[in-house]
UniProtKB/Swiss-Prot annotation:
Description of how the protein assembles with itself and partners: NDH is composed of at least 16 different subunits, 5 of which are encoded in the nucleus.
UniProt name for this protein: NAD(P)H-quinone oxidoreductase subunit 1, chloroplastic
Organism of provenance: Capsella bursa-pastoris (Shepherd's purse)
EC number: 7.1.1.-
InterPro entries noted in UniProt: NADH_UbQ_OxRdtase_su1/FPO, NADH_UbQ_OxRdtase_su1_CS
Length: 360
């Protein structure tokens, strides 16, 4: 009996150990996701505050200053206000499409953050097809906008949804061709491999110098994908009131508001990863890997700081562009995408392919 009881206790202890391992495994799955979401939310709040301050400076007026020190909590105050507003629905609209549209737009953008390397070995999902996954997922967002426009049963919303779909298709193709050129240079579709391929010569090893034409096209296409001025045709206030957002209020309108800044942040991060060397130093022959080998925490922190510094540099350019340039007409926007950017990006891809073949 004593041997039997001992065996039972041993088996129970092993069962408890296995269950604890499963619990710890689940915890370690959700902890990185939690910190990533927390960082994304913080980044969006900072972007909103920066845009308000930069726009105030360009327009020579006083920006937000009452909600927290220097108005840094203004975005949080706006979010709380939208959270408590009534969530109205159009009486003759398509309720399922109207409700699902904002969620599709936000979720498709959030999933793209999983393949962003913020520092060395600091990435949620290091996939061999990371760039391809981002392009595939980002193509889903316009479907949510089109569903929102159609489900609102409003002519302005529907026109805004159609414009969003047309604009996304027009600029997704040149953007994809630029990304393929970078993949050819790096011989990989992994975001980590692309960053490491730029780490040899510091500032001079960036893809910005090897792909200057692709960088400019990617920059323009990214602004168009984010629907920022001068490419904000889907929600042009003078023409469509608020475009596909016209019938939305409360938290659903807030989701669209957050989605626009999430898209701007992810585009800036991909500019950093693809063209500006990611987490690598700008100084030649000084690698972040050396710091990482000496002290992992310090090296990772420096890598995050470098990545965010480059990202917010592009964000500043995007915000300044919004408050500087006038809006294009719809025909000008489509002509720019199909007749100008697409042929140049295709020629850039063919030229890159030729150089890679001759260098073998």
């Amino acid at each position: 009996m004593i041997i039997y009881a001992t065996a039972v206790q041993t088996i129970n202890s092993f069962v408890k150990l296995e269950s604890l391992k499963e619990v710890y495994g689940l915890i370690w799955i959700f902890v990185p996701i939690f910190f990533l979401v927390l960082g994304i939310i913080t980044g969006v709040l900072v972007i909103v505050w920066l845009e308000r301050e930069i726009s105030a400076g360009i327009q020579q007026r006083i920006g937000p200053e009452y909600a927290g020190p220097l108005g840094i909590l203004q975005a949080l105050a706006d979010g709380i206000k939208l959270l408590f507003k009534e969530n109205l629905r159009p009486s003759r609209g398509n309720t399922p499409l109207f409700s699902i549209g904002p969620s599709i737009a936000v979720i498709s953008i959030l999933l793209s953050y999983s393949v962003i390397p913020f520092s060395n070995h600091l990435i949620l999902a290091d996939l061999n097809i990371g760039i391809f996954l981002w392009i595939a997922i980002s193509s889903i967002a316009p479907i949510g906008l089109l569903m929102s426009g159609y489900g609102s049963n409003n002519k302005y919303s529907f026109l805004g949804g159609l414009r969003a779909a047309a604009q996304s298709i027009s600029y997704e193709i040149p953007l994809t061709l630029c990304v393929l050129s970078i993949s050819l240079l790096s011989n990989s579709l992994s975001t980590v491999d692309i960053v490491e391929a730029q780490s040899k010569y510091g500032f001079w090893g960036w893809n910005l110098w090897r792909q200057p034409i692709g960088f400019i096209i990617f920059l323009i296409s990214s602004l168009a994908e984010c629907e920022r001025l001068p490419f904000d045709l889907p929600e042009a206030e003078e023409e469509l009131i608020a475009g596909y957002q016209t019938e939305y209020s409360g938290i659903k309108f807030g989701l669209f508001y957050v989605a626009s800044y999430l898209n701007l942040l992810i585009s800036s991060l991909f500019v950093t990863v693809l063209y500006l060397g990611g987490w690598n130093f700008s100084i030649p022959y000084i690698s972040i890997l050396e710091l990482f080998q000496r002290d992992q925490i310090f090296g990772t922190t420096i890598g995050i700081f470098i990545t965010l510094a480059k990202t917010y540099l592009f964000l500043f350019i995007s915000i300044a562009t919004r408050w500087t340039l006038p809006r294009l007409r719809m025909d000008q926007l489509l002509n720019l995408g199909w007749k100008f950017l697409l042929p140049i990006s295709l020629g850039n891809l063919l030229l890159t392919t030729s150089f890679q073949l001759f260098s073998l």
